[in-house]
Amino acid sequence: WKTSYLAISYLNNIINNLESKSEKDFRHYNLYMGEALGLRAVIHFDLLRFFAVHVTSTDEVAKARAIPYVTEYDFKVTPYSSVEEIYSKVIAELKRAEAYLSEDEVLMPAERVGNENGFTGARVLHFNLYGAQATLARVYWMKGDLDSARIYADKVIRSNKFRFASKTSLNTFMQKTVSMEETIWGLYNAEVYSDWLTQHVRRQGLGDLTTDFKSIYAYEGPTGKKDYRLDNWFGTYNRSGTPVDILVKVMGNVSDTTSLTTSYNGGPYLGTSMIRIPEM
């Protein structure tokens, strides 16, 4: 709650200052404004999901008091808005971001290989046009407006700039990196492995899998085919002498010493995917 609103305050400072400027003042004015508006909407949407009741709740008192939607950088206390009001504000802000970020149609290539230079290079590491559209699809879906969700998901799909990971890349496509195939937008983070190891693997409870987690995945199909995710996304960690099942999809092999590397040497960018094409 606190860190989210702290981040929102930084974004409000950026947006409030940009509103007194124009494209003639900054070369990438539209990208700056689009990213800031989009991120502000995303964080408010996450706060709504975490701290408010669902839009279909019958608790009208709780629905009337969801979260504050803060848009000013000042000491004024922002009153709470209703769940419906938050959805309206998030959607409106994401549509504004979409309009500002139209340049990404040209800036984002269909084939991403890494090593892009400059602010307009690695757009997959910024909140971008397709991030706005994918988030709109997710917001509309959660709101229950499936027709609108389909419209925005279709925009991302028809851009032909994102595809599902192949079965041969399942063990590496997002280990410590944003996927060059599936990621619509992500954040650069060179500490994914150490963060995951410290917060989810070494500490009992936080990253533990349920004893029946394998039942989610099909062991073998009628023709001998199997679910590749089970073999590629899970491993074992020795915690104080006791072997425990862990998820290695994000962090990589826990015994791989190269996982400790925090320097970028080309290829997929070190970081975390914020939304991928199957997550819209």
Give residue spans per PLM region.
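Residue-level signature for tetratricopeptide repeat
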Residues: I43, A137-V139
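Hydrophobic-face positions in mid-chain alpha helices that act as interaction patches
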Residues: H126-F127, R150-I277
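Extended ligand-binding groove/face enriched in aromatic
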Residues: R40-Y73, E93
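Short coil/turn linking the two alpha-helices of tandem helical-hairpin repeats
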Residues: L48-V55, E105, M142-D145
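Conserved, well-structured interaction surfaces
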Residues: W1-F51, V77-E84, L94, A99-L101, ...
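Acidic interhelical loop/turn segments
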Residues: E19, E23-H28, A99-Y130
